[in-house]
Amino acid sequence: MPAAAAAAARTMAARRAAGEPLQYIFGPWPFRDLNLRVDARVLIPRPETEQVVEVALGEARRLAAAAAGAGPGDGAGPGLVAVDAGTGSGAIALALASALGAGVLRQVWATDRSAGALEVAAANVQVCSPMVAGGLPDIELVRGSWLAPLPERLRGHVDLVVSNPPYVTEEEWAGLDREVRTEPRQALVAGPGRTGVPGLADVEAVLEEALLWVGRPGAVVIELAPHQADAAQDRARQLGYDEVRVEPDLAGRPRALVARRSGSE
C-alpha cells in the first residue's frame, strides 16, 4: 500500500476508534437518491427523515393539484414555495427539489441558525444540482431561526413547511451512544414544550411560526418522537390548523406530524 494511502487509513481508523460516525469519516452518504456531504457541523440524515420526506412529497403533490391552473398570490409565477426550516445538510430541501423539480416547485427556502451548517448545505446544493435531470428549482439558503429569516413578501404565500427540528430530551441525550453525541447537540436536543412535554419546544416553535407564513391551502410537516405525537397534535389544533394527523415511520411508530390549513377561513 502506498505510504499516503496507509497514512489516510490510519487516520480514518483513529477517528473511528474515537467514536466518530462512519458518515463523517467517509464523506458523501446516501439520502434517498442523493449522496450528501455530512460532517460534524450537521446532523446525519436518517431513514426516519426519508419517510418524513415521503409524507411531505404527498402534501406537495396534493397542493400542486389543488393549485393547477391558478397562479400564486404574490404574482411571482407558477409553482409551489416550500421551506426546509432548520436545513442542516440540506437533505430535506434537496430531496424535495430533486423529487418534484421545477415543474412543481418554484422555489425552496432552506434556513438554519448555524453558519457551518449552511456551508455544508451550499456544498451539497452545488454538487447535487448537475446530477438532477432538468436541474433543480431555485434553492435559497438563509441564516436564522426557523422561518424568521424569510423575506417579508413570502408572508402568507408559503405552500409547504417541512422540518426536522431537535426533539431529543435532555435525559435521552445523556443516555445516547458516544457516536451519536458527536453530532451537533443543538441539532438534536430541545427543551420542554408549553405543556411541559419533554423535547417538544422546537416542534411547537415551528408550528407557531408557520402560521405567519403558510397560506391557504398549505401544510406543515414536522418530524418528532413517537411519545410526542399526541401533545403535538393537540398543540396544532389549539393553534388553529384545520386538519391534523401523524404518519408512521417504516417501523410503524408515529413520526411525521402533518398540520394543514384549508383553502378558506
Question: Which residues are covered by each model-predicted region?
Answer:
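Class I S-adenosylmethionine-dependent transferase superfamily signal
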Residues: 96, 180, 206-210
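Conserved beta-strand segments of alpha/beta enzyme cores
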Residues: 35, 107, 138-140, 242-245
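Conserved Class I SAM-dependent methyltransferase catalytic core
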Residues: 192, 196-260
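Conserved SAM/SAH cofactor-binding pocket of Class I
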Residues: 51-174, 205
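Flexible, glycine-/basic-rich loop-and-beta segments that form/coincide
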Residues: 262-265
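Mobile active-site "lid"/loop adjacent to the S-adenosyl-L-methionine
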Residues: 166-205
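Conserved AdoMet
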Residues: 1-59
